[in-house]
Each structure stands twice: as C-alpha cells, then as structure tokens.
Design a protein with these regions (language model features):
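Low-complexity, glycine/serine/threonine/alanine-rich intrinsically disordered linker
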Residues: 294-400
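Aromatic- and Gly/Pro-enriched helix-to-coil junctions and flexible linker segments
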Residues: 183-341
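Structural microenvironment flanking redox-active thiols in thiol-disulfide oxidoreductases
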Residues: 65-106, 113-123
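A short beta-strand-turn-helix
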Residues: 31-52, 200-209
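Bacterial N-terminal signal peptides
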Residues: 8-18
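Conserved redox-active cysteine motifs that mediate thiol-disulfide chemistry
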Residues: 57-70, 220-224
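Short active-site neighborhood of thiol/selenol oxidoreductases, capturing the structured segment around
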Residues: 44-65, 170
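Thiol/selenol-based redox catalytic cores and closely related redox-interacting motifs
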Residues: 117-192
C-alpha cells in the first residue's frame, strides 16, 4: 500500500507539471506578427493599454471555436477600458488561406496573429488551443493564464459558466487590483511544436554549415565593412557578440528589412528569411550560439560590391552624373537636401537602366531622382516644375 501511495503521489506531481504551460508572472519579450488580413502587430506598441488578451486559436478545434464566442463578447465589454484582444495561431498545418476561411465560417472579428515560425508560441510555452493569457503592459508579465471560464469540458458544456476566470482577471486589472486567481487549467487541442521537443538538438546546429551561409546570403550585403549596416559580420566572434540583438530584431521583424507579405506572389530580390531560416538562427542563438567545428565561412566570404551592377548585361554606363560631396554631421537634424544637375545629353533618349551609387552607405538614407524643367518664377522658383517633372530612380537601404 505504501508503494502505491508513493506511485500515486509521483503521478500527481508529474500530472500537475503538465497541466499549465504559460506561467503567471512570466516576463514576455517583444515580438511582431502579421494577422490574417496582413496587418502587422508589435507587442510593445500597445504599451498604453491596460491589458492585452490572447486566445490561442487553431483551425478545427471545437473548444477554441466555442470559446471564441464568449471571447468576442468580452472584447466588446473591455475594449472601452483600453483592453486589446487578439487570437494567436501557432499551428503548423494552418495556412493564411485556411485561417481566413475559418474566420469567415465562425465570424472571427479579431486579429489572428499568425505565428508561422512557431517561435512566439515556443517562447510563451503555449501547449493547447483554447488557452487564454493576459499580458500586463505595465510590467510585460503574464497576469493570467488558463481557461476562459468553466463552461466547457472535453465531453460536455454547461449552459452558463459558474466561474468567469478571464472576466474576473480583467476586472481586477482594469480596477488596479492584483489578480486573485492567476492560473487555471486550460482545455483544448494540443499544438505540435516539434522543435520544442528537439530542443537538445539545437546545440548541434552548425555555425559553419547552417548559420554562416544564411548570414552570407541574407545579411552581409549590408553588414560588412563599408556597408550600411551598423556593424560588420566579419567573423564568428562578431556574430556571437551581437547574437542576442540579432534575436531581438528577428522576433520584431526589424531585420532583414523586408515588408512584403510572403504569402502573396513572388518578389524579386526578396530579402526576407524563410520560416526555417528564422527558426535555425533563433534556436542557435537561444542555445548559446555554439561555434562547433569547421572553418569560419565569414572569414573567407567574397562580398561583391559592384559599382555598376548592370554591366554583365548592358556593358559600361553611357552617362555618369557625379553629385558634389557633402559633409554630414554625426548627430543632429539635417535639412532635406536638393541637388540640381544640368542634363548635358541634349536630346531625347530611351533609358534602359539607372543606378545610384552611394558614396557612403552608412550615411546616405535615401535618394529620389526626378527630371524636368526648372521654374523661373513664382514660389517654387529654382525648383522642378511639377507639370514637367518625371521620376527616374530611387534609392533606399537594401535596394539593389
């Protein structure tokens, strides 16, 4: 009998560990995700709110579908109290199209943040759809995590809930009180996080074979000596030193600088990272950025800095316009600068290609080039005439 009691106790301890995923008072790091409509949401942008509420959504989960009705009702109650509601989808199998179809079928009116890399769900340790969690923007900690209420179980559902866990927590937060019940058991469909189970293997990610090639293909065009990046990826030590900053800008999508929606069409010169590349980089950083074996490809990388990138196809340029050198102060506000260059061609021509070559990529932010006639009188004297002005070429960081 004593052995049986010990076994039961152990089972209860193990079971209790597995009930809850997100921990109350857990600190939440900043992230950015797109919703099903293409809108971008950065967590820390909502710092002026009283609370941020998330329902973990997944297509096909009956509990999440059922809970969404009450979740929308609570949104209408608390939106006037500066509480923002979201859904979070970390399912591997759900696509943007299928999420849109699910939203239309069940009348979801809230942003569904699509965590296609699963990095955010992993970091939050989400386990099931139907789970709700509340973030307090004053501390960026989890204020409540668990079930929305006690109305739903796996086999049954009550007509009315007798315990209103989420509503009670939001009442307390918006009234400036501490949350009395910060954690409850959540029910729903288990979410498959394969990389979470393979966490031990993240230390085996190869810097030489996996990490450095991603950086060379996607980052070193800017992050190199003389490039427009603020620091140069010259070797492993530099990358390791900036690795935590890299993780931050990857999670918030500040890097790589690419804003087009990857689910719509194909874009030339796409600088975005694939979901697999994002996972590889972040998991490598989270495992301590191990050096591993092999050469350092960054030491041997040949970074092309072609002055005239069209030369292989079109040959040397027919016309080169030099802009006078300008000294830019290291700090302060610089007025918008206009440079006028006389067109010396003297005849109409067809333009096949143009290119802007910055003198210092670390200083130049952008260029807009136009051509046309100059105003000789009026308030815009000495400036281009809008009626004759035509655009020619632009430049901004990251443009090829």
């Amino acid at each position: 009998m004593k052995d049986l009691k010990i076994l039961i106790t152990l089972l209860l301890i193990l079971f209790s560990v597995g009930i809850y995923s997100i921990e109350a008072n857990q600190k939440v790091e900043n992230f950015r995700l797109n919703d099903q409509l293409g809108n971008s949401h950065e967590l820390f942008y909502y710092s002026d709110h009283e609370a941020l509420v998330f329902l973990v959504q997944g297509n096909g989960c009956p509990i999440a579908r059922n809970a969404s009705v009450r979740f929308h009702e609570l949104e209408k109650i608390f939106s006037e109290k500066k509480v923002k509601f979201f859904m979070l989808n970390s399912n591997l199998q759900d696509t943007k199209r299928s999420i849109l179809e699910e939203a239309a079928s069940y009348n979801y009116q809230l942003p569904i943040l699509m965590d296609k890399t699963q990095l955010i769900g992993e970091a939050l340790e989400v386990t099931r759809t139907g789970e709700v969690f509340v973030i307090n923007p004053k501390t960026w900690q989890i204020a409540y995590t668990g079930a929305l209420d006690d109305r739903l179980t796996y086999e049954n559902q009550k007509k009315e809930a007798s315990e209103h866990f989420l509503k009670d927590a939001l009442d307390e937060i918006t009234e400036g009180r501490a949350v009395t019940l910060a954690t409850t058991e959540s029910l729903g469909c288990l979410i498959n996080f394969p990389e979470q189970r393979n966490k031990a293997n993240h230390k085996l990610i190869s810097y030489s074979e996996d990490i450095a090639p991603i950086l060379i293909d996607n980052c070193t065009a800017c992050h190199r000596k003389g490039g427009l990046g603020p620091w140069a990826m010259t070797d492993y030590n530099m990358v390791k030193g900036f690795s935590l900053m890299m993780r931050e800008v990857l999670r918030t999508k500040r890097m790589p600088p690419w804003h087009a929606d990857p689910s719509i069409g194909h874009f030339s010169n796409d600088r975005s990272l694939s979901a697999g590349e994002m996972r590889t980089l972040v998991h490598w950083i989270e495992s301590g950025s191990p050096r591993g074996k092999g050469k350092d490809p960054l030491l041997e990388a040949e970074i092309s800095d072609s002055v005239w990138s069209n030369e292989p196809e079109l040959g040397p340029p027919d016309y080169v316009i030099d802009i006078p050198t300008t000294d830019i102060p290291a700090t302060g506000v610089v007025d918008y600068k206009y440079h006028f260059v006389k067109n010396k061609i003297g005849k109409d021509i067809w333009v096949r290609a143009t290119e802007i070559i910055p003198g210092d990529k670390a200083v130049l932010h952008h260029v807009i080039t136009s051509f046309g006639e100059i105003n000789v009188k009026g308030p815009r004297k000495g400036r281009l005439n809008f009626r004759t002005m035509k655009g020619l070429r632009g430049y901004a960081p990251g443009i090829n």
